[in-house]
Amino acid sequence: MNEKIENLLKEERKFPPSKELKENANATSSWYEDADKNRLEFWQKQALTRISWYKEPTEVLDDSNPPFFKWFKDGELNLSYNCLDRHLETDSDRVAFYWEGEPGDTQEITYQDLYERVCKLSNALKQLGVQKGDRVAIYLGMTPEIVVSMLACARIGAVHSVVFGGFSSEALADRINDAKAKTCLLYTSPSPRD
């Protein structure tokens, strides 16, 4: 193996946060101390208390094949559930994200609104025959719908592949075909405003 790569795999340097960052961070100094004492135990605790699992992982880190590390490889979760559902009981009206497009074109998307949009699209994808493991190409602009599309795919276990909108039709076809996409989500007009 290349010596430079080998050296990077054995990185020992530490980069502590600045005083200002520490004072304004959500993490307390005890977090840093706990992480320093036993990083695997620290991350296991974070994963088990901050993430909803369908099947809790029994192994924190598989580092048997560097640099292809696998974290929590035997755990099972749903990203869409963790991003949306777990917030509905207490924070449904809280803003999940702010979107800003053209000047004056802004939206505040609440968890409840995002959840409803995601469920509607994930059900539509299922009606089209999209299943867990299928690939869905996403050819959308930078709009709230791109977030909805990615979370809808995650909700049903489909893999999304965002395709850059600046490619020629031939390049788009190549990428969509290479991904073996079962379906493609796109606008029917060049711009969502048209």
Predicted regions and their residues:
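N-lobe entry segment of adenylate-forming
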Residues: 1-109, 113-116, 120
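Conserved AMP-binding/adenylate-forming core of the ANL superfamily
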Residues: 80, 97-151, 168-173
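Structured binding elements
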Residues: 157
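Short beta->alpha connector loops at strand-helix junctions that form conserved
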Residues: 163-164
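Active-site charged/polar residues at nucleotide-handling catalytic sites that mediate phosphoryl
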Residues: 179
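Short, Asp-centered acidic motifs that coordinate Mg2+ and/or phosphate
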Residues: 183
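Conserved small/polar residues in nucleotide/adenosyl-binding loops
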Residues: 187-194
